[in-house]
């Protein structure tokens, strides 16, 4: 995508199911899991020289939270129409915790967890947010069957 394209406002709910990559992992927990890997934005509060240039952006070009929620609903609707009812969402960026609606996105995903066979969420983060933020994160992920974090080590 070019810089001229306002991808932060792109309506991802219009993507046909056949263009969404899904992975059924029968060896993982013995069920098909629809996996979504989502880069929530390029902004990162660290500017490490060894990180990929995409993630060293100062641009806070996050998609609007409401559009993210609609996209989640559409992905799940299409996945369910195609026989999936177990989901794994992997959220990264830049630094995903700086998406202004990150906790809202988690709460939206969690609200549907009871209606699924299995729902998990994973975050790759530099863990730079304060403890109050992480306390809110812990509360937001309680409804999930599983939640995990990969902490990035930053030596610069």
Q: What residue spans do the PLM features occupy?
A:
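Canonical Radical SAM [4Fe-4S] cluster-binding loop centered on the CxxxCxxC motif
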Residues: 27-70
